Amino acid sequence: MKTYLLLILCTCTLIASAQPPTIYKTTTLEIDSITPGTYVHRTYLSTKDWGLVSCNGAVYTNKGESVVFDTPATDSVSLELISWIKTHTRSCIKAIVVNHSHADCLGGLAVFHKVGIPSYSSKRTQTFAGNDTVNKPVVPQHGFTKELELKIGGTSIINYFPGEGHTQDNIVSYIPSVKVLFGGCIIKALGSGKGNLAEANINAWAESVRNVKQKFPDAVIIIPGHGAYGNRSLLDYTIQMFGK
């Protein structure tokens, strides 16, 4: 166990030192370039139980088209992100993919709809968002059950429901051309804790991540919902955290 923890700490240090430089930064939005045309957007969500939480999303651009994975939590920061994409990448945003029904995934969805960007999620996310009478989130427009392929500049984007984990509706999104997996909150950053378990299925979580690992064996860069992105060790770390 001590050896495993030492390996995790060493890996965290290596990944932290290898993180690409931030190419855009304001008090509300940070953007890292992780491959040519692939970016992590990092924003902040104010929570009652956890304070100010850093949240990851992603952007992929190809041949003048782009897709966004998860919105910032607010309309204003979502507008800032959309503006940056249009100005910096000079691409047309063809889709926003929502990972699950929490605010760190769809809090700014109204802005995307307002400017004509179609949204996609699992059908479960549509149901949970539609039934949330407390927060009353905007509901994604298009839903799928198990898997959805989108085309961005002719390149495939695979959106996949691996099973329950952080929530009952969490999905992952894979970009084969750059071998980047946006795992969202079902994937934990190295060294992180279990996080928000209010709607989690902790008994299914490890098996769901095993499904991700098996489905996308070529994924090289893994982006969690919170914390530092890294390599496939994030999958193993999450499996061990929730494994029996």
Annotated model-derived regions:
Residues 1-20:
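Bacterial Sec-dependent N-terminal signal peptides
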Residues 22, 26-29, 34, 65-67, 73-74, 123-238, ...:
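Metallo-beta-lactamase
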Residues 35-82, 172-185:
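Conserved beta-strand hairpin/beta-sheet module of binuclear metal-dependent hydrolase folds
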Residues 37, 60, 70, 85, ...:
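Divalent metal-coordination and catalytic microenvironments
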Residues 42-55, 131-132, 192-200:
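Acidic/histidine-rich helix-loop elements
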Residues 45-48, 66, 73-76, 101-105, ...:
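Solvent-exposed loop/turn segments at secondary-structure junctions
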Residues 63-67, 76-120:
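Active-site metal-binding motif and surrounding structural segment of the metallo-beta-lactamase
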